[in-house]
């Protein structure tokens, strides 16, 4: 017979950001322990609220399944002597498996006879196993910043205040951090009280009666439905913000949404100035009309019921009014100083003690951005607009608005630039240059935004690597991986045919001209090429590229990001064709043999067989056209041209032996194969394909 199992860990208030990770850990750990302990079950659920974590296993077997296993021991010839008596090897093996030597039996494996022991383990009652399972579940949870409390050495998200552990209606007896397990849980902090749980099956129902909705998905759905219903009452809607919705879900136990109003005199402010305090500081949901225009309403979610809801509404409106009053003041004050005049104030803002001020950084970005525009062949007027964008891009960092609302950097700069009559390209570039701000964010679309964004991110990456700051494992405090991914994404989307090595060198020079010392350029180039190649690999894999396709392409380097991606695209298509098999076979055969060649160039006069003479002539005939295709980055046509050589290469291998005794002839043939490898490998090192 099966019973339900419940473990609830009651704590002090837990940060919302911990919840998703804990849910995954609890589920994975519980599944793992049940499998290891041979405990069958029907279903497994995990729960979290700000004051508890819980796991409910439905239909958990009352005892382990019995266990029978056949364990391989030594070979028969080592297990028995000439008289058939067990040797010390057999005796030791039997003893280790808990069986008698006479119980060993023989089985054949891969043509060799071995002795085996058959082990049988009777399943234990589940209740005997659960105290340790509960303890292991608790100690197996990990948090970003665990804490200690009282005089305990144990660390947890927040202090543990109660533990519920039930198997059916029976308490699972154990003690942890000075707390004895039991049936006593706690309801909502103000609306509920002590809750004596009768059985795991009634957990959700009993907790809901105590104003705790333990299922986070149920809470999330309730929040979303209430928000939509309230927005509809004023003819509006709420744009789905999963991050905000998740955060709100994990800071409440019993959701009640309410509609608040925004004072009309603040609606003239730029939309981000209104919505940022709402979302980032107050966790409110802005309400919009059907066209997406902001309405003078917000929705917030209370952790409680509808008691005194009017008073709660007024309190939230008052808090938002104070926030918006500050924002309105900052907005007025910031407009008194033109954006261009703020640039010089950046000299007093330290970017990094080893990398100078933000003003110095602006100059580096400005120089690099113009250089990129020039490398892309842009006319002088566009280069000027790129340079102007770079000059003003960081100016809003010293505004009152951005000082109080850092999330608005770039957004306010673009708005203030518009006010003083900067060109649209400059305003858009200022707005976009921080993009992508997070994983999955949009890339800049304007040329000013793209170029300044790449220059900004490259300066940050080169500077950080140059003073020895690199991401390690899961640690990346300067978000260098995200910035590198942004650089890769922008270059790919814009289709720039540009050398990463040259950009890194140009950025390095900018630091040197300001007297800022970095690690040697050669060391930086090597580290950064590897770093960007990892990011390129990640981006292309996300787009569906196979790992071995990327191995083949990236073995030839990724200095020109767009070209490497184009190669991967062509190779992915070509490897699916029937013609690719003989092509790759010819490449690999040529490659393996050419490795034995000396470094001398091919001299066709040393070739004697008609097949090799014809192949050498074909290589010369196609050399100029092939080089032109590679220069253009037309890898599909380059592959097609290289494919014309395959019949001639096959004819060569059928007609002659490469490794002949005549050293001059042998080296000529090996050099010829080396020339073939150079052309056939136009898409990558095909020997790395699985």
UniProtKB/Swiss-Prot annotation:
GO BP term, example: arginyl-tRNA aminoacylation
Major subcellular site: cytoplasm
Enzyme Commission number(s) from the entry: 6.1.1.14
InterPro entries found in the cross-reference section: DALR_anticod-bd, Gly-tRNA-synth_bsu, Gly-tRNA-synth_heterodimer
Subcellular location: Cytoplasm
GO molecular function: arginine-tRNA ligase activity; ATP binding; glycine-tRNA ligase activity
Matching PROSITE patterns: AA_TRNA_LIGASE_II_GLYAB
Recorded superkingdom: Bacteria
Pfam families: DALR_1, tRNA_synt_2f
Signal peptide residues on this chain, from the entry's feature table: none
Chemical reaction(s) catalysed: tRNA(Gly) + glycine + ATP = glycyl-tRNA(Gly) + AMP + diphosphate
PANTHER family, sorted: GLYCINE--TRNA LIGASE, CHLOROPLASTIC_MITOCHONDRIAL 2, GLYCYL-TRNA SYNTHETASE
Descriptive protein name: Glycine--tRNA ligase beta subunit
Assembly description: Tetramer of two alpha and two beta subunits.
A GO cellular component annotation in the UniProt record: cytosol
Protein family (similarity comment): Belongs to the class-II aminoacyl-tRNA synthetase family.
Keyword terms: Aminoacyl-tRNA synthetase, ATP-binding, Cytoplasm, Ligase, Nucleotide-binding, Protein biosynthesis
